[in-house]
């Protein structure tokens, strides 16, 4: 086996891979193994197919049906509308997935002790047998982020935060892979569930924006701001990261020092690096959200600065700003 797979770099002092893998479990439970990560690749391929089918054969035709009473008058209008339908279908596909994922994830952790006492993520770690349903939840989540990376690189229109989104998805995939290998699945599920909540509202808000439902969009955007701050700027750093930094060493290896890089294992430091990078991205997007909120108050237009760099969207934005300026005059 490669040197980097040595348990010395991954597990607490005195614990080997065989100690975990040879543990017997009750029916319906399992211990994670890195070989299981192939399931994320298979589910990723399945979700790419799911996206193609749902977008092209369900959501785009549905958008056509709902807009049939207002046909475009020009060829340019037809092209613009088809482009809008495609983007709405993309948002609808993601919103549907996030909704199902959030509901299922919440159901899986709702009766688990570590949802209410996060120190249960570390007590007796890594000897935490994982319910098969949680394993599938983890694999599907990993597969979904593989599908998102594929979409960003080959399918989606390029957005202003293209690189940030790509980095975010790779960080998430790395966290899923490493946490599965180390059996830090308990804390991983808490992160995934809490992050899915706001993603539902973001994609629903984009659909409302495309359809120009201004009142509903404003309400949805207020919900995005509230849930974003609650889950990604409060719960994530002050509950999850704080527990990883303080509780985990105290309950697993009490002499562990994060900044003593000669001390093993090293994998927790890699996880902390990824968690911190994710938090930085959360702060970056929070800045964008509050910028949108400020512009909305000043100009009366809820606009998503993450939308596509295309001539038409820029023209529409400038028109809206000019109209509001004329009203003020």
From Swiss-Prot:
Biological processes per GO annotation: ceramide biosynthetic process
Membrane-spanning parts: 41-61, 95-115, 134-154, 162-182, 187-207, 221-241, 270-290
Disruption phenotype annotation: Animals deficient in HYL-2 show inability to adapt to oxygen deprivation as a result from the loss of ceramide synthase function.
The protein's enzyme class: transferase
Known pathway: Lipid metabolism; sphingolipid metabolism
Domain of life, per lineage: Eukaryota
Subcellular location as annotated: Membrane
Enzyme Commission numbers on file: 2.3.1.297
Membrane topology note: Multi-pass membrane protein
Catalyzed reactions: a very long-chain fatty acyl-CoA + a sphingoid base = an N-(very-long-chain fatty acyl)-sphingoid base + CoA + H(+); a fatty acyl-CoA + sphinganine = an N-acylsphinganine + CoA + H(+); docosanoyl-CoA + sphinganine = N-docosanoylsphinganine + CoA + H(+); sphinganine + tetradecanoyl-CoA = N-(tetradecanoyl)-sphinganine + CoA + H(+)
InterPro entries in the cross-refs: Lag1/Lac1-like, TLC-dom
Organism: Caenorhabditis elegans
UniProt keywords, alphabetically: Glycoprotein, Lipid biosynthesis, Lipid metabolism, Membrane, Sphingolipid metabolism, Transferase, Transmembrane, Transmembrane helix
Residues annotated as glycosylated: 22
Pfam families, A to Z: TRAM_LAG1_CLN8
Protein name: Ceramide synthase hyl-2
Gene Ontology cellular-component terms listed: membrane
UniProt key word Lipid metabolism: yes
Residue ranges of domain TLC in the record: 86-298
Function: Catalyzes the acylation of sphingoid bases to form ceramides, which are key players in cell signaling events such as tolerances to heat, oxidation, and ultraviolet stress. C.elegans contain specific sphingoid bases, which are unique or different in structure compared to the sphingoid bases found in other animals. Two examples of these distinctive compounds are: 15-methylhexadecasphinganine and 15-methylhexadecasphing-4-enine. Exhibits substrate preference for long and very long fatty acyl-coA chains (C20-23). Required for adaptation of the nematode to anoxia.
């Amino acid at each position: 086996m490669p040197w980097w797979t040595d348990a010395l770099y991954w597990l607490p002092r005195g614990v080997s891979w065989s100690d975990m893998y040879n543990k017997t479990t009750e029916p319906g439970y399992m211990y994670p193994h890195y070989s299981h990560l192939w399931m994320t690749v298979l589910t990723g391929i399945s979700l790419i197919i799911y996206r193609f089918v749902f977008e092209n054969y369900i959501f785009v035709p549905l958008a056509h049906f709902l807009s049939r009473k207002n046909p475009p008058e020009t060829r340019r209008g037809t092209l613009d509308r088809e482009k809008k339908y495609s983007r709405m279908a993309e948002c609808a596909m993601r919103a549907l997935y996030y909704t199902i994922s959030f509901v299922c994830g919440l159901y899986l952790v709702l009766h688990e002790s570590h949802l209410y006492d996060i120190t249960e993520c570390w007590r007796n770690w890594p000897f935490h047998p994982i319910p098969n349903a949680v394993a599938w939840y983890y694999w599907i989540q990993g597969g979904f982020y593989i599908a998102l990376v594929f979409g960003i690189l080959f399918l989606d229109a390029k957005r202003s935060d293209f690189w940030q989104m790509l980095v975010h998805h790779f960080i998430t995939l790395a966290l899923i892979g490493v946490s599965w290998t180390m059996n830090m699945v308990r804390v991983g599920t808490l992160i995934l569930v809490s992050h899915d909540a706001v993603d539902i509202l973001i994609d629903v808000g984009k659909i409302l924006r495309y359809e120009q439902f201004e009142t509903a969009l404003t309400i949805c955007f207020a919900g995005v701001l509230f849930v974003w701050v609650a889950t990604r700027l409060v719960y994530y750093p002050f509950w999850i990261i704080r527990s990883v930094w303080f509780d985990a060493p105290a309950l697993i290896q009490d002499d562990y020092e994060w900044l003593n890089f000669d001390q093993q294992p090293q994998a927790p430091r890699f996880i902390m690096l990824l968690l911190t990078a994710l938090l930085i991205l959360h702060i970056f997007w929070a800045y964008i959200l509050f910028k949108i909120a400020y512009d909305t108050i000043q100009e009366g237009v809820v606009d998503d600065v993450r939308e596509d760099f295309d001539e038409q969207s820029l023209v529409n934005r400038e028109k809206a700003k000019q109209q509001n300026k004329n009203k003020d005059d």
